[in-house]
């Protein structure tokens, strides 16, 4: 059986067609019932006329509730008044399940919709979100496959923290404490010595008690590690990747973007190269718009929001102070107080979507930084081992796919960008 989008063409006008889906809207007037049916591909109006159908059939159709699952058969006609420009003149139908009252109506509050996310996913708006997310995830993988990378898998349960332990979820593992992973980075680094270029897509977990519009406690993390490249080359790859993903979304999901009131032309204009601005310069930018930041202050969500309102495409902020970043980032030889790293900030107030850096590949430097950070050396023995046996320069990054989706779709809150958001106050449905 064809989808609604496949049926809704001039080629089928005058032909007998069949569609399956769910009742999106229904109304009756003067012995005619208009049923708008939806499936994942679109909507179409099915018209049932009382004088053309058995009385019991017409009565059943006219009493269908929203989200009833149905199958309609009839002749396809053109009709400019119908939502899609086509309608099916119904001659028979089947009800899979008839609903009375669907719980979700037009004017429901945000918390109600979150409590009933399992039903709200059916809305045309959220169907658009899901389609765009699918394109984003697929495009990320396609970009790296097309450039000779290997997709790999890493553990979710770990004993060693990538960036310290204050925001880790602790789990009892047969009497031993372990943690839910925040990043696959360390494990990806082990694999560059066999595959050189690797990536992964997996959930990450952060026990941050944050209530901002862009934070989740469980989020989808896309990460890559690459042998033989430096920080600047890593940024080259990332800006090409972002442009590739955005281009695929504008090509494949123009209708979905418009459904969400996102202008595809705005996204099409965001072509690389993206500006690369040193942290010391971004502090000056912040000061110029009235933000009282000084050198050594980290950029928070609000600062990033205000700074990125100045830009019409993503920017890189590079060379952060050493004290603000994790131990595995090497110092800049020309500026020993700074590290060879970068954050990519999305424009239009969305802020950080990528964090990346060159990685320390020298054994002595790594050991010194571990000790400076007062970390347990024994917990990192296997990570340190990588610097003993054929170590090479390498770089990597982590991309928050939900944040990327939020920006691409121009959504107000990250909870709108993921099917089932997990926050400090929400673990269901």
From Swiss-Prot:
Enzyme class: ligase
A single BP term in Gene Ontology: asparaginyl-tRNA aminoacylation
Catalysed reaction, written as an equation: tRNA(Asn) + L-asparagine + ATP = L-asparaginyl-tRNA(Asn) + AMP + diphosphate + H(+)
Source organism, top-level taxon: Archaea
InterPro entries per record: Aa-tRNA-synt_II (IPR004364), aa-tRNA-synth_II (IPR006195), aa-tRNA-synth_II/BPL/LPL (IPR045864), Asn-tRNA-ligase (IPR004522), Asp/Asn-tRNA-synth_IIb (IPR002312), NA-bd_OB-fold (IPR012340), NA-bd_OB_tRNA (IPR004365)
Main location: cytoplasm
One Gene Ontology term, aspect cellular component: cytoplasm
MF terms (GO), sorted A to Z: asparagine-tRNA ligase activity; ATP binding; nucleic acid binding
Keyword Aminoacyl-tRNA synthetase attached: yes
UniProt KW Zinc-finger keyword: no
Pfam families: tRNA-synt_2, tRNA_anti-codon
Subcellular location as annotated: Cytoplasm
EC number: 6.1.1.22
UniProtKB keywords: Aminoacyl-tRNA synthetase, ATP-binding, Cytoplasm, Ligase, Nucleotide-binding, Protein biosynthesis
Family stated for the protein in its record: Belongs to the class-II aminoacyl-tRNA synthetase family.
Record-linked HAMAP family: Asn_tRNA_synth (MF_00534)
Protein name: Asparagine--tRNA ligase
């Amino acid at each position: 059986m064809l989808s609604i989008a496949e049926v809704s063409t001039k080629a089928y006008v005058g032909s007998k067609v069949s569609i399956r889906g769910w009742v999106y809207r229904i109304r009756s007037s003067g012995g005619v019932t208009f049923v708008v049916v939806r499936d994942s591909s679109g909507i179409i109006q099915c018209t049932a006329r009382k004088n053309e159908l058995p009385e019991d059939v017409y009565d059943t159709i006219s009493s269908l509730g929203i989200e009833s699952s149905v199958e309609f058969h009839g002749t396809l006609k053109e009709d400019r008044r119908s939502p899609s420009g086509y309608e099916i003149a119904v001659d028979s139908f089947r009800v899979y399940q008839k609903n009375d009252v669907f719980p979700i109506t037009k004017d429901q509050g945000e918390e109600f919709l979150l409590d009933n996310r399992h039903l709200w996913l059916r809305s045309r708006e959220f169907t658009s979100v899901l389609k765009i997310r699918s394109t984003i995830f697929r495009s990320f993988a396609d970009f790296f496959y097309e450039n000779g990378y290997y997709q790999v898998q890493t553990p979710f349960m770990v004993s060693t923290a990538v960036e310290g332990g204050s925001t880790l979820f602790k789990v009892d593992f047969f009497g031993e404490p372990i943690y839910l992973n925040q990043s696959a980075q360390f494990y990806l680094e082990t694999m560059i010595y066999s595959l050189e270029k690797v990536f992964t897509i997996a959930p990450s977990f952060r026990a941050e008690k944050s209530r901002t519009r862009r934070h989740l406690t469980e989020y989808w993390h896309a990460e890559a590690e690459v042998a033989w490249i430096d920080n600047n080359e890593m940024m080259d790859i990332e800006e090409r990747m972002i442009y590739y993903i955005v281009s695929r979304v504008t090509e494949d999901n123009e209708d979905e973007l418009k459904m969400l009131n996102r202008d595809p032309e705005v996204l099409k204009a965001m072509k690389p190269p993206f500006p690369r601005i040193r942290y010391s310069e971004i502090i000056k930018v912040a000061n110029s718009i009235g933000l009282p930041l000084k050198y050594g202050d980290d950029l928070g969500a609000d600062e990033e929001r205000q700074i990125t309102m100045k830009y019409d495409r993503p920017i890189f902020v590079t060379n952060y102070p050493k004290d603000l970043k994790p131990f595995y980032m090497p110092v800049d030889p020309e500026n020993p107080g700074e590290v060879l790293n970068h954050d990519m900030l999305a424009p239009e107030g969305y802020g950080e979507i990528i964090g990346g850096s060159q990685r320390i590949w020298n054994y002595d430097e790594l050991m010194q930084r571990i000790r400076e950070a007062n970390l347990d050396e024994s917990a990192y023995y296997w990570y340190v081992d990588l610097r003993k046996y054929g170590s090479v320069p390498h770089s990597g990054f982590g991309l928050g796919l939900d944040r990327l989706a939020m920006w691409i779709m121009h959504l107000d809150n990250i909870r709108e960008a993921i099917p089932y958001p997990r926050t400090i106050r929400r673990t269901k449905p």
